[in-house]
Amino acid sequence: MPGSTDATMTAWTQEQSLAERFALAVTQLNRLKGVLVRVRGRVTLGGTANEMIILHRAAGVGLHQTLPLVKALLERDIKPCRIDVGQLVGAAPAADNPLASLEQIRQEANAQDHPNAPRDVVLYGFGRIGRLLARTFIERSGPAALMRLRAVVCRPGRDPVADLRKRASLLRTDSIHGAFNATIEVDEDNLALIANGNRIPFIYAPRPDDIDYSRQGISDAILIDNTGVWKNQSGLGQHLQSQGVGKVLLTAPAKGDIPNIVYGVNDEQITGERIVSAASCTTNAATPVLAVLDRAFGIDQGHIETVHAYTNDQNLIDNFHKADRRGRAA
């Protein structure tokens, strides 16, 4: 005979209780010790009890297994790091004694050199890519963060306060990713957004080569150019002339001798370059899978079809475009 409704509800209530305690422990670990907890690669910070239950079920591990691990971490001295408790529970021989494996990870984390402060990051451009990057940096901010969003650069020309309000609205809501789970305040007097405690000044500048980022306390920053306006050494090199910029990352395929890097495929080619491209969206979508297939089986030739959303420089009508494949019907 199937279990009674009361028994099912009791089991659910107990699981919810475990999930609530797990979510609280994860939050305390991040805030107090700078430890970011994952379950089989999925970030747990900021999740609700129901989200924790769904996440654990998808990972095939139980909250009764992971909760003791995060509670043990709270009781131990540990430096900022990232720990996947789902892998600890499910991996052999760690599955026999996950606490022993946890202690080994703690010792390894404490033995590593940790930066005194996260690396400064500047977003040059705040379109769709820029806003999604901002979401990621804000979501991952905290004591364990290795990078910190310090400023955003936008084109001048409109009333800056009205522009900032609109950009805050676009950051809050995305047509694909939905509402951004963050508190966003608009500091009109100082032209800045305050997102989850991160103060992000907005700099309105017409050129990339005459901005003094050090006035915002920024130094040796990674500047992420997501405008696509400049794609070669001479154009992107203008950023390096501004005070406070250490390296430049382009979020589009580059031209000339700038290396196009797909992480996990050819990132070992990054040596002393100060300007690097993250390649195209199509390249990042296809290359990691192709690289695995090529290493395992070999690829002689192939054909790739890409289905791409229209971009913001296209009309949502049947029309011409300077790039042949972009002059298409909507």
Regions found by a protein language model. Give the residues of each.
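N-terminal Rossmann-like NAD(P) cofactor-binding subdomain of oxidoreductases
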Residues: 2-315, 323
